[in-house]
Amino acid sequence: MVTVEEVRKAQRAEGPATILAIGTATPPNYVDQSTYPDFYFRVTNSEHKKELKAKFQRMCDNSQIKKRYMHLTEEILKENPNICAYMAPSLDARQDMVVVEIPKLGKEAATRAIKEWGQPKSKITHLVFCTTSGVDMPGADYQLTKLLGLRPSVKRLMMYQQGCFAGGTVLRLAKDLAENNKGARVLVVCSEITAVTFRGPSDTHLDSLVGQALFGDGAAAVIIGSDPMPEVEKPLFEIVSAAQTILPDSDGAIDGHLREVGLTFHLLKDVPGLISKNIEKSLVEAFRPLDISDWNSIFWIAHPGGPAILDQVEKKLALKPEKLRATRNVLSDYGNMSSACVLFIMDEMRKNSAEEGLMTTGEGLEWGVLFGFGPGLTVETVVLHGVST
């Protein structure tokens, strides 16, 4: 008679969860950050709000963003004037867009990841799909399964309304799935579109305007599995540990509410301070088992919520400027793409490391950290191990 313990042992993988491929995608349309205030105030019929436009111009100029990709074009916005108002009923129009576009953009990223992986998609056993853009049943996970032609028996998990920390969450979940299911290959997709949050400016709610200056569209996909097949699968990073915490005294610091007017976004001014004040505690807990306490000795992938967060974290931890290079590059080229950002940064880092002939995928370093920050205020801390290039 076989025991439960023997069954469990046979079910488990031997080695750690490993990232085997990364793919990214954006809509074709993009906006130039320097001229975006002109576009934004024109399409929202707000050009008479001269002082507010000047404030928004300063926000965009100080954002450290050069361009952002957006599904929303001037033509789409002209057809949907309620989306351009500050608070007008518009959820139906927004939903009609995102339920189609979110899986579609996710498919582009997933297709690229599968191509890099080089294995038949029939080997994908699990799908984790994450978006903060819209809600539907069956979900974007179901739609993507159909679009990609995955097996109907693929085990799906749909994550809606998590926000900007979720790029860390999906890795934490995929790690547990891969390590507890021998032979599992988990396709993780984060797909985000600002069609749910776009709205006109308000003199009284400047935090909403901050979101309009920062958010962009993008999708990223990774394939994760344990015990990579030698000579067949190429490991990029190993996921060593993953943790989540709610920061103290941070209630209401970042909120999002799905309403008739779309997804409203609320942000308190002290978010960068809350994160920078508490981040070292998460680092100490994550790296104590590895006997690491020099934060410049590891590689960094941090969700670029905005330039102030990165600046304050850098200052608080006395990080060398190059530590956040990949993070700042993604912020500059894409803006804040919510959950997808950290996966874009991971992709940028491994490509740069290879191009520069560095010893590992993590900028030549062995150990690294991936941080997700978002509503709660919630922090995801993922310890990564760079792989030899």
UniProtKB/Swiss-Prot annotation:
Known EC number: 2.3.1.74
Top-level taxon of the source organism: Eukaryota
Catalytic reaction equation(s): (E)-4-coumaroyl-CoA + 3 malonyl-CoA + 3 H(+) = 2',4,4',6'-tetrahydroxychalcone + 3 CO2 + 4 CoA
Originating organism: Hydrangea macrophylla
Protein name: Chalcone synthase
Alphabetical keyword list: Acyltransferase, Flavonoid biosynthesis, Transferase
Family according to the record: Belongs to the thiolase-like superfamily. Chalcone/stilbene synthases family.
Gene field: CHS
GO terms for biological process, alphabetical: flavonoid biosynthetic process; polyketide biosynthetic process
